[in-house]
Design a protein with these regions (language model features):
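Domain-level signal for Mg2+-assisted phosphodiester chemistry and nucleotide/NA-binding surfaces
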Residues: 2-3, 9-120, 166
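Nuclease catalytic cores that cleave nucleic-acid phosphodiester bonds
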Residues: 95, 99-200
């Protein structure tokens, strides 16, 4: 089944299994995933909890046959902030999940979680921005694929593109970030059917 190419971004957007973009096999790709944000988006779509999400299928979908330089997963580290059994269960569940990702070859980058009036991640976006910039300077990749939704990363994306690298924004077709799509070289938008195929 082929899906229409979206016209919300320039120069080209990809939806589902159809794309108008040639991918040289020698092209080096680094994938940056904001884990907390991706979890929320999947949960909104009924994928989590109760189902497993196949990150290997997501990576294959984003690579499209190109060479993987590295895949990075950024997340706030859960703490037992109130010394309860429930919080400890959450700590252990996250550690188990991240260990499983490491076995799949992911580099795990941990930020902090602040517990005040609401639970907030801190430091994750900064880590992504720094790694995007350093990776472009040190020629670690030709293309950065960013699975994010925070427009605070736009300055880093603009800098990376100014150095002759490409940045692909990967989001969900129902609610893409128009700001990130506009500033990126390419947008890859997952349709509901794509997400369903990645859920075990």
């Amino acid at each position: 089944m082929y899906n229409a190419v979206s016209n919300i971004t320039a120069p080209v957007a990809i939806q589902g299994q159809f794309w108008l973009y040639t991918c040289p096999m020698a092209e080096k790709v680094t994938i940056f995933i904001d884990g907390g944000n991706l979890y929320k988006r999947l949960k909104e779509r009924g994928v989590l909890p109760g189902k497993r999400f196949n990150y290997a299928k997501l990576i294959d979908f984003l690579l499209r046959g190109r060479s993987l330089s590295s895949k990075r997963y950024y997340v706030g580290a859960v703490r037992n902030y109130d010394q309860t059994a429930r919080s400890q269960e959450m700590v252990e569940a996250q550690q188990k999940f991240l260990s499983a990702l490491e076995l799949q070859g992911f580099l795990i980058e941990r930020g902090r979680i602040v517990y005040d009036h609401k639970i907030r991640e801190k430091g994750v976006d900064v880590k992504i921005a720094i790694d995007l910039v350093i990776g472009s300077v040190e020629n670690e990749y030709d293309t950065a694929v960013v699975v994010i939704s925070d427009t605070d990363l736009i300055p880093a994306i603009k800098y990376v593109i100014s150095r002759g690298k490409k940045v692909e924004y990967a989001g969900f077709a129902e609610r893409p970030s128009l700001g990130l799509a506009r500033e990126s070289s390419l947008s890859v938008l997952l349709l509901p059917d794509d997400v369903s195929r990645m859920a075990n």
